[in-house]
Amino acid sequence: HAGVGAAIPDALNEYRLQRLKELGCNAIRTSHNPATPALLDLCDSMGFMVVEENRLMGINTEHIALLERMIRRDRNHPSIIAWSVGNEEWGIEGKECGEQIARTMTDYCHIIDPTRVTSVGVSGGRNIARGVDVVGYNYFVQNDVDAEMVRYANRVAMGSEETSGCGTRGVYFDSERDKGRMPSFNRTGFNGDTTVMNVIGRGWRFYEERPHLAGLFYWTGFDYRGEPNPLKYPATGSQFGIMDYCGFAKDEFYYLKALWCDEPSLHLLPHWNLAGHEGEEVEVWAYTNCDEVELFVNGKSMGQQRIERGDYGRWRVIYTPGELSAVGYRNGEATYLALHNTVATANSVETSEARLQRDDCRVVDIRLMCDGAFVPTACDRLRVAVADGVEIVGWGNGDSAFKYRERPSRGDKEFIIEAFNGCAQLILRGAGDISVEIVQ
């Protein structure tokens, strides 16, 4: 997570799980290593189901010792529903030894914990799947899932990984400024294939249409350090997340929220600060659980569309600065309004602090505003000052090409940070006031 790396305080894990619950998520897979006991405590209390994953697959003394340590340590956590013994073991997936290793590990798991099933993340190899209780398919396009379920009629299976659509929060066009950043595959076509749009919905529809399969996990909930694939430097982190590495929502967050939550939801993309694209045709999408959506540009209707569950609205319009809005209808009645305005440069900041039960850190989100409206392109420098008794643990902004010093020197009471596409985040420790102002 931004500002702390992998040494995540309990309160910050609580914040991350809260964010997942806001989009309707009810299960996590700890890839590709066991969770901390503190994270599992949170999952127990917050109602998450957990597939806990072993770090190394094998049956030598060291491998078995690691597996045993994980299970003995964590088997009393009610949130855990399965032990994953491995993931994408390409060297052995399609070999007899892969099945034998998986079966031996499964048998050992059952000795230590006879109450839970085992799983493994499979990326195309058939043999290894026969050695576990619940097969995890990593990307159905890499696995002939339907044929496998016919061939093994009693098989229990789930989607252990599906793609969310890689991309940078708030980026919709390739440009020199955004080198190291990228528009989401959901809008550009997966791997450049424009016949596969909104790829996040592809995996969901596959599993929703097959009730004999036990749902799916998306890769990933949050961006993470390293693996900037398909980009390279100056990208410094992955962009696979439904949220960036601060927990700020990408557009795909709202696609899943519309599917997984009951309250009316309507999200428009892109934002309407598209300087340099005046007069060009742009695609506007709507993620929603409303029955129908009518889109307006500067008050003029662009048409009304009926949107089926799991689908999305799509209009081609000429970009004209001003107001982009939409009205969502349920049962013929207007129930939701979404609105984007073209706004000028930021002239103020808005801060909000997460309400958390754990108290080992504070999470403060910062949004850059212009006369009360969010500025989705603002990348201003910000001066942060904290009162005595408050420590700045770290900060971030969700930029996948982030290269700044993210932790001030111990004892610093003032620090300069930078927003990315309208947002930044502070991780603090200790009670007391803070101030944030734009550096002119």
What does each of the following model-derived ranges do?
Residues 81-83, 102-111, 118-119, 129, ...:
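Substrate-binding clefts and catalytic carboxylate motifs of secreted carbohydrate-active enzymes
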Residues 122-141:
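Aromatic- and acid-rich polysaccharide-binding/catalytic face
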Residues 284-288, 327, 359-376, 436-439:
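Beta-strand-rich structural segments
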Residues 314-319, 411-432:
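Short, hydrophobic beta-strand segments
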